[in-house]
């Protein structure tokens, strides 16, 4: 779809959506997003120019269907997939991608760390994906030197970052906010550093006794990104990994640096969103969202969860969806899903489905709470179908139609029950929705009350 759109831009020094928006140009991607979000083109252009909305759209991702991440658009959901040295292969990752897109992922991140040819799996995912693809390049940078921190140099990072851009990656998590002076702040934590990318860079700084190369070479990364329109997802290396560590000095020190890096990227006309925690008690979620908006000048916020309790391994898609719904309500632009396997193992395709549905619920609930135009239309339509016992319509409107039909049919599988005015919960005689209160019923009731000298029904 985009091949003809981007053909004229190739070779330009800066092809980012932010660059065009600041020149007053409405790109085809902005027009597409405006129609998709039911927003005026001018508003989309203004939000992109201001940095409050990004359209991750690498010029080398030709089959991408453009989408927006920002406060003015609907709350989005990212699904993480990726192979590890211990599990998965290319076919398995493509199956996860297919399921993620089927169940509504707005973006997908390939977090492969090994076990497969990383370039092969990434290009296969990009070529098969209509949604933006994100990556964490430090994983491959370390893999390229066979896991040897001592052999990893600054140019290795930049080489991998540009390779990902050339392959069509739409946004990259760049852990540039973790500085060498932040490392002492980690000592008082219960769980230390829980970001894999952050852990790699902390090891690099401790071994080489030098500043984070992604920070010192940040302007070079900006120069790479603007040639491809790759967006920054500024990584939160010091996100809290437990309730105890939430909103601590380490997290907030890095957030301040991320705010400064946001401005530096904007100075290059490069699009930016900022990643956030993590594990956060419910009473601290609003503070975290407001603080990010303040420090990062309202750049889109992209949070992992946050998990609101740490005692439910196997159910962290639930513990985190609670926090995600709240974060979305307070203004977070995109939610990164968590699967039931979080903290336990590599997710399989069914885990992807479970995590994604939990987060689509959270994002949709946030849109309703924020009174986004049309956000509740589907809810109202399903409610009408429920009241009218239109079972097939209910299934069709569900976030997971297959699961809804499966649960209904476990006890009432025959087709005749798709017209029944009950389910197996209440049975044929006790469903309250069978009670239809009509105007005729109310007129009869009012006449009866009047004949007995009772008060009239309220209007």
Swiss-Prot record:
Record bears the keyword Transport: no
E.C. number: 4.1.99.17
Pathway in which this enzyme or protein is active: Cofactor biosynthesis; thiamine diphosphate biosynthesis
Catalyses which reaction(s): 5-amino-1-(5-phospho-beta-D-ribosyl)imidazole + S-adenosyl-L-methionine = 4-amino-2-methyl-5-(phosphooxymethyl)pyrimidine + CO + 5'-deoxyadenosine + formate + L-methionine + 3 H(+)
Domain of life where this protein originates: Bacteria
Positions with a binding annotation for substrate: 80, 109, 139, 175, 195-197, 236-239, 275, 302
Entry function: Catalyzes the synthesis of the hydroxymethylpyrimidine phosphate (HMP-P) moiety of thiamine from aminoimidazole ribotide (AIR) in a radical S-adenosyl-L-methionine (SAM)-dependent reaction.
Protein name stated in the entry: Phosphomethylpyrimidine synthase
Organism in which the protein naturally occurs: Prochlorococcus marinus (strain MIT 9303)
């Amino acid at each position: 779809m985009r091949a003809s759109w981007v053909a004229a831009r190739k070779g330009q020094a800066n092809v980012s959506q932010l660059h065009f928006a600041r020149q007053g140009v409405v790109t085809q991607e902005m027009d597409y997003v405006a129609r998709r979000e039911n927003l005026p083109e001018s508003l989309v252009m203004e939000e992109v120019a201001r940095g409050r909305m990004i359209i991750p759209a690498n010029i080398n991702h030709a089959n991408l269907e453009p989408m927006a991440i920002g406060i003015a658009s609907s709350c989005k959901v990212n699904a993480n997939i990726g192979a590890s040295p211990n599990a998965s292969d290319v076919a398995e990752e493509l199956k996860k991608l297919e399921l993620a897109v089927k169940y509504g992922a707005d973006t997908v991140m390939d977090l492969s760390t090994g076990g497969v040819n990383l370039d092969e799996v990434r290009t296969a995912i990009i070529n098969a994906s209509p949604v933006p693809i994100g990556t964490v390049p430090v994983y491959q940078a370390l893999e390229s030197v066979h896991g040897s921190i001592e052999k990893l140099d600054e140019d290795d990072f930049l080489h991998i970052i540009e390779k990902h851009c050339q392959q069509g990656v739409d946004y990259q998590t760049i852990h540039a906010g973790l500085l060498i002076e932040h490392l002492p702040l980690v000592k008082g934590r219960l769980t230390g550093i829980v970001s894999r990318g952050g852990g790699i860079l902390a090891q690099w700084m401790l071994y080489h006794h030098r500043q984070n190369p992604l920070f010192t070479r940040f302007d070079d990364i900006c120069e790479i990104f603007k040639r491809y329109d790759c967006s920054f997802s500024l990584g939160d290396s010091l996100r809290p990994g437990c309730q105890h560590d939430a909103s601590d000095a380490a997290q907030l020190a890095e957030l301040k640096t991320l705010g400064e890096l946001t401005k530096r990227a904007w100075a290059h006309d490069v699009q930016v969103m900022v990643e956030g925690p993590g594990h956060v008690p419910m009473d601290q979620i609003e503070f975290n969202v407001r603080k990010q908006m303040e420090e990062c000048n309202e750049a889109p916020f992209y949070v992992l969860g946050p998990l609101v309790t740490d005692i439910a391994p196997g159910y962290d898609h639930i513990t985190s969806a609670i926090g995600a719904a709240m974060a979305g309500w307070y203004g977070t632009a995109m939610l990164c899903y968590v699967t039931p396997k979080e903290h336990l193992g590599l997710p399989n395709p069914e885990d992807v489905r479970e995590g994604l549905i939990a987060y689509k619920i959270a994002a949709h609930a946030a849109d309703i709470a924020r009174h986004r135009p049309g956000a509740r239309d589907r809810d109202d339509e399903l409610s009408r179908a429920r009241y009218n016992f239109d079972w097939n319509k209910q299934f069709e409107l569900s976030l997971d139609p297959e699961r809804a039909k499966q649960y209904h049919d476990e006890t009432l599988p025959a087709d005749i029950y798709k017209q029944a005015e009950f389910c197996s919960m209440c049975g044929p005689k006790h469903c309250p929705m069978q009670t239809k209160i009509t105007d005729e019923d109310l007129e009869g009731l009012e006449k009866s009350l009047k004949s007995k000298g009772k008060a009239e029904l309220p209007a």
